[in-house]
């Protein structure tokens, strides 16, 4: 059963009611949540802070590395192939416990794509993929801390460890 889905550019789907991502369904659900929490003397922000206190603070960030000029696409391709030929074993001191290579549809059950996902020993993830429209490689980080500052510091450690690879 599909519950919800969303994307980086703020498209949102909830349930089977709407078949294309838009802001209308997300706005409606936020209004319903706000009304509910107000009816019990709370607020969306207050409830969100309670969730953070219970589960920690997840952070999702993206870094982009540009590869301009005629040689940019070749550099990007070589970089992605290099990550496949000599797989990373750790990032910023965190062991990589699983690598999912989306160029292997037999592993994912999905169509082939030039995407690598690294699952770290602390539950964080790092996703590396070339942009489909620009001469860039994007790295997506999902980190967790007790608070936002911890999650941001963890993201920065991972980013610093990966910068030399993107040079």
Located regions from the model:
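Active-site beta-strand/loop architecture of penicillin-binding DD-peptidases
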Residues: 142
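Phosphate-binding and adjacent anionic-ligand microenvironments
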Residues: 1-129, 136-138, 147-153, 159-167
């Amino acid at each position: 059963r599909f519950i919800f889905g969303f994307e980086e550019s703020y498209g949102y789907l909830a349930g089977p009611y709407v078949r294309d991502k838009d802001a209308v369904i997300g706005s409606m659900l936020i209004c319903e949540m706000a009304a509910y929490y107000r009816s019990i003397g709370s607020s969306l922000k207050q409830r969100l802070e309670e969730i953070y206190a219970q589960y920690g603070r997840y952070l999702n960030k993206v870094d982009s590395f540009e590869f301009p000029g005629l040689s940019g696409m070749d550099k990007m391709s070589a970089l992605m192939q290099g990550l496949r030929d000599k797989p990373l074993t750790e990032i910023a001191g965190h062991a990589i416990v699983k690598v999912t290579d989306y160029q292997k549809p037999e592993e994912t059950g999905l169509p082939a794509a030039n995407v690598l996902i690294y699952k770290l020993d602390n539950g964080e993830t790092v996703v590396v993929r070339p942009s489909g429209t620009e001469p860039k490689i994007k790295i997506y980080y999902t980190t967790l801390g007790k608070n936002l500052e911890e999650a941001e510091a963890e993201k920065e450690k991972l980013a610093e460890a990966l910068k030399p690879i993107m040079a």
